[in-house]
Design a protein with these regions (language model features):
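Secondary-structure capping and domain/repeat boundary segments
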Residues: 1-70
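Short, surface-exposed linear motifs at loops/turns and structural transition points
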Residues: 67-215
Length: 215
């Protein structure tokens, strides 16, 4: 009698389109190269890199994560809700499928780095990123942060409870999007560094002038 081996096959999809049938327990290799999604592929809360091997235990539908751009708005604004302070605003631009992944707020998150201008210029190489060793405020938008004013992809980071002696101190910011992969590595996409450092006094004066113009 010949043993009969039954193999269970599961369908693998990318963006809803079948790309392969894989035996349960075996691996599927994600696309790589020029035709692959730039930042990899997402499934069930996990981001995978191009060319990564993924063990198939059930049907899988990966979402392509393509171009992501984050742009910092010029200048700064006054934060008036809750604790008062200085607010910087950024916006994320991405295709629809990538934006669905960003909206899940698990493997891809966003934030704002804020620091004093004199600390930034004192580095010598004028660098502001997540690895900066000088005093920097990292404001993560987070799951509960939502989008600013209900506009998808727009978020803010604020510095609050600023001491009076710092009202004339210039502050600046840089926005970022962070992708956390299954292999515990990260890729960070940054905006340009703000080219218009602002003091609390400057922003407050502009806010008052703008408010008065509405009467």
């Amino acid at each position: 009698i010949t043993d009969i081996k039954v193999e269970i096959v599961k369908e693998v999809k990318i963006d809803g389109t079948r790309v392969d049938n894989v035996v349960v327990g075996e691996t599927y290799t994600l696309p790589s190269g020029d035709k692959a999604a730039i930042y990899g592929y997402y499934c069930d809360g996990v981001m995978y890199k191009q060319g990564e091997e993924v063990t198939v235990n059930d049907e899988i539908d990966f979402t392509s994560v393509k171009d992501i751009t984050v742009t910092l708005a010029n200048g700064a604004g006054i934060r008036t809700q809750d604790s008062a302070g200085m607010r910087f605003q950024a916006s994320i631009t991405a295709d629809d499928t990538t934006m669905t992944v960003i909206n899940k707020q698990d493997a891809i998150t966003e934030g704002m780095l804020i620091t004093a201008y004199n600390l930034y210029t004192g580095t010598g190489d004028h660098t502001l990123d997540l690895k900066s060793t000088y005093t920097t405020l990292n404001v993560e938008n987070g799951v509960k942060g939502g989008w600013y004013a209900g506009k998808e992809g727009t978020y803010c980071g604020s510095i609050v409870n600023i001491q009076k002696e710092n009202y004339i101190r210039k502050f600046m910011a840089r926005a970022y999007v962070e992708i956390k992969y299954s292999d515990n590595t990260e890729e960070v996409i940054y905006s340009d560094v703000s080219n218009e450092p602002r003091t609390v006094r400057q922003v407050a004066k502009a806010y008052i002038a703008d408010s008065n113009s509405n009467y």
